[in-house]
Swiss-Prot record, chain B:
Main localization, broad class: membrane
Domain of life from the UniProt record: Bacteria
The protein, known as: Photosystem I reaction center subunit IX
The organism of origin for this protein: Synechococcus sp. (strain JA-2-3B'a(2-13))
InterPro entries in the record: PSI_PsaJ, PSI_PsaJ_sf
Recorded topology in the membrane: Single-pass membrane protein
Pfam families named among the record's database cross-references: PSI_PsaJ (PF01701)
Record field: transmembrane: 7-27
GO biological process, one term: photosynthesis
Role, per record: May help in the organization of the PsaE and PsaF subunits.
CC per GO annotation: photosystem I; plasma membrane-derived thylakoid membrane
Location(s) in or outside the cell: Cellular thylakoid membrane
Entry's family note: Belongs to the PsaJ family.
Length: 181, 39
């Protein structure tokens, strides 16, 4: 009950907090395509590459050609982001949804992958724990079992939620060893 | 052959095989989708 009430309080506070102002000029950033310094940087990079193409040997020209294509594609893509006065793109990381691709989605993906690997290792250790020689299975990996653990761990958020809800994730107090004192 | 597969599954060797695969995957992703800054 206490946990439930504290969760409810946390939810109320989270919902009650004033929404951050969504207007982009207020964070001092403008779309990169409107920032003069960004345009200058783009022109400088592209023209230096074009100059290199003109002076390059026939063997090197295609390399610079490819580099030019990649660079112009990069600037085209970054021009949709928000830039500061210095002409470099800034990523908006405060969780606003119209910039989710800049931090929110990669961040969640990172947490998902980190949790996936951790959960896979954990379930492997739990699976070998009750066998004859668990230490041996840690140095000589049981590959089919490990692959199975990796596959089942793909659903780790659901599995973790289930274990937390059922209390299975906790060890009883008596089972936790303490050092002599 | 059994000894060789056993050698391949020792933790350091398995780790090197696995990480070679992962690093190669990252290199290839960066080759085909260079300069990723956003999704």
């Amino acid at each position: 009950m206490r946990t439930f009430l504290s969760l409810l309080l946390a939810l109320c506070i989270a919902l009650g907090l004033a929404q951050s102002v969504q207007a982009e000029p207020l964070i001092g950033l403008k779309p990169c395509s409107e920032v003069p310094a960004f345009q200058a940087l783009m022109n400088e990079r592209l023209s230096s590459l074009e100059e290199k193409i003109l002076n390059a040997s026939p063997a090197m020209a295609p390399v610079y050609q490819q580099k030019l294509a990649q660079t112009s594609k990069r600037f085209e893509r970054y021009s949709k982001l928000l830039c500061g006065e210095e002409g470099l793109p800034h990523l908006v990381t405060d969780g606003r949804l119209n910039h989710a691709g800049e931090f929110l989605i990669p961040g969640l993906l990172f947490l998902y992958i980190a949790g996936w690997l951790g959960w896979a290792g954990r379930s492997y250790l739990i699976a070998v724990r009750d066998e004859d020689s668990p230490e041996m299975k840690e140095s000589l990996i049981d590959v089919p079992l490990a692959l199975r653990c990796f596959l089942t761990a793909l659903a780790w958020p659901a599995a973790a939620f289930k274990e937390i809800a059922s209390g299975e994730i906790r060890e009883p107090e008596a089972a936790v060893p303490i050092s002599p004192r | 052959m059994a000894d060789f597969t056993k050698f391949l599954t020792t933790a350091p060797v398995a780790f090197i095989l696995f990480s070679s695969f992962v690093f190669a995957l990252f290199i290839e992703i960066n080759r085909f989708f260079p300069d990723i800054l956003t999704f």
